[in-house]
């Protein structure tokens, strides 16, 4: 585990470090910085949800307005994409939205860890959602669900080719869903570290360069605000695409 205060490499912030080693029968169940911050995000989600139920007032304060805004955004997303049938899936979609939002925002805290910056997490989450959505489709439509891969009126000669193309375009959703979140969070945090390192180098050099370090520092502050917006946007986009994919399965699009 790195003990120095200044991170020397822009990619060092993504290193998974074992905090508490633990294994059973050769299986590794160690607590890492990634799992630790994921647990923190889950506890924050539970805490936020409990406040939503028990700390409301007739005249909403600023904190209550934030809670209600996130709820309304998610509810509107579900209503626009799933309609009335989305009410059954709202608890899952709302939880997913909040979890990703907290994971992204926690990663903006200096010397924390961005769980969503690792493709292992985003791909695992996207694959789990994809499997669940397909199970819902099979449960809802039975074997008719597989008609998704064969549109009506297709000539028999091109059926094998079309099924292959439709199947590949269907499973690629897992990769687009996971890579989009992973790539945006990784690239944004890397850029922030590079600019922060550049500002620190200029300040350490002293003299005239120490004065001009305010330029990259101002740029860093501006990009930090932009990255905060991206953190919220990527959580929204991931959840929105989940709603769209779920609707495609329910309506056989």
UniProtKB/Swiss-Prot annotation:
One example GO MF annotation: proton-transporting ATP synthase activity, rotational mechanism
Superkingdom, natural source: Eukaryota
Principal place of residence: mitochondrion
Keywords: ATP synthesis, CF(0), Hydrogen ion transport, Ion transport, Membrane, Mitochondrion, Mitochondrion inner membrane, Transmembrane, Transmembrane helix, Transport
Membrane topology, as annotated: Multi-pass membrane protein
Subcellular location: Mitochondrion inner membrane
Transmembrane segments: 34-54, 89-109, 118-138, 156-178, 203-223, 226-246
Gene Ontology annotations for the cellular component aspect, listed alphabetically: mitochondrial inner membrane; proton-transporting ATP synthase complex
SUPFAM superfamilies in the cross-refs: F1F0 ATP synthase subunit A (SSF81336)
Pfam annotation, one family: ATP-synt_A
InterPro entries, alphabetized: ATP_synth_F0_asu, ATP_synth_F0_asu_AS, ATP_synth_F0_asu_bact/mt, F0_ATP_A_sf
Function in brief: Mitochondrial membrane ATP synthase (F(1)F(0) ATP synthase or Complex V) produces ATP from ADP in the presence of a proton gradient across the membrane which is generated by electron transport complexes of the respiratory chain. F-type ATPases consist of two structural domains, F(1) - containing the extramembraneous catalytic core and F(0) - containing the membrane proton channel, linked together by a central stalk and a peripheral stalk. During catalysis, ATP synthesis in the catalytic domain of F(1) is coupled via a rotary mechanism of the central stalk subunits to proton translocation.
The family this protein is said to belong to: Belongs to the ATPase A chain family.
HAMAP family (alphabetical): ATP_synth_a_bact
Name of the molecule in the record: ATP synthase subunit a
Lineage: Eukaryota, Rhodophyta, Florideophyceae, Rhodymeniophycidae, Gigartinales
